Amino acid sequence: MKALVEYLNHKKLIFKSLQEILPKELGSRKKVSLYVGVDLKGYYALVMQLEKKSRVLRKEAGDLMALHEKLEKYVGSSITKKYILIKAPLCSHAKAMLEENGWKVWHEPE
């Protein structure tokens, strides 16, 4: 988590609080790290971290957006800012789909 906080500071994002939520709590078996934080203006933000060897396709991007909706119900509040850090090969259609739906995508190919 320390590496993630340093990465977010590098991107000029500072949170008052940042807590990890396990995908298992949302009924998901995805290998993804979920962090919900409150920024300095008081808005909820979601930071997803995804690391894998295979390509992230458009179908999986849809699954990640569905996970965001489940997380909003779990937290009981609207999450306005959505960030995703992907350390895997990324399909251009999946990236476009995420960006169209308000996600800020940081892609670091391995």
Question: Model features per residue range: what roles?
Answer:
Residues 3, 19, 33, 49, ...:
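Sparse, context-dependent recognition of short Cys/His-centered cofactor- or disulfide-binding micro-motifs
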Residues 77-110:
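Short, compact, well-ordered microdomains
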